């Protein structure tokens, strides 16, 4: 789960894929013009932002076409707290990592470079900058 710690963001209301459960704090991307959860292979330039509220199968509007709230960074260095699969260490600071899924950083992979570690909070939690959207740094 990603939670903004500091920096400027804006809230955008975007269309979501109907009948799709998503968790608050998930990175989201578009598929056929509707939001879906980002995956471990989603490129940074395709990721829109962070979903603000959980979408559950028990929601009254779960199967309804609707707009949902997404938090989108409006400046480059917004800091986010995120869960990490395991093993985050001080040597990871400054390095780019990928996602395990839409909610979790994979510190052992750096194919897509979705986040950059700025602080280690524990072996399973850190602070990161997102490398997403149209300004995402391309993998060298």
Model region roles, listed by residue range:
Residues 1-140:
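Surface-exposed, low-hydrophobicity beta-strand/loop segments enriched in small/polar/acidic residues
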């Amino acid at each position: 789960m990603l939670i903004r710690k500091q920096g400027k963001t804006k809230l955008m209301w975007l269309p979501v894929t109907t009948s799709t459960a998503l968790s608050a704090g998930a990175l989201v991307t578009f598929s056929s013009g509707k939001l879906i959860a980002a995956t471990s292979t989603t490129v940074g330039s395709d990721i829109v932002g962070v979903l603000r509220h959980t979408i559950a199968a028990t929601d009254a509007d779960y199967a309804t076409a609707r707009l949902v709230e997404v938090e989108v960074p409006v400046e480059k260095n917004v800091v986010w707290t995120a869960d990490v699969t395991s093993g985050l260490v001080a040597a990871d600071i400054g390095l780019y990592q990928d996602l395990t899924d839409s909610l979790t950083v994979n510190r052992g992979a750096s194919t897509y470079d979705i986040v950059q570690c700025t602080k280690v909070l524990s072996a399973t939690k850190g602070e990161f900058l997102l490398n997403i959207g149209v300004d995402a740094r391309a993998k060298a």
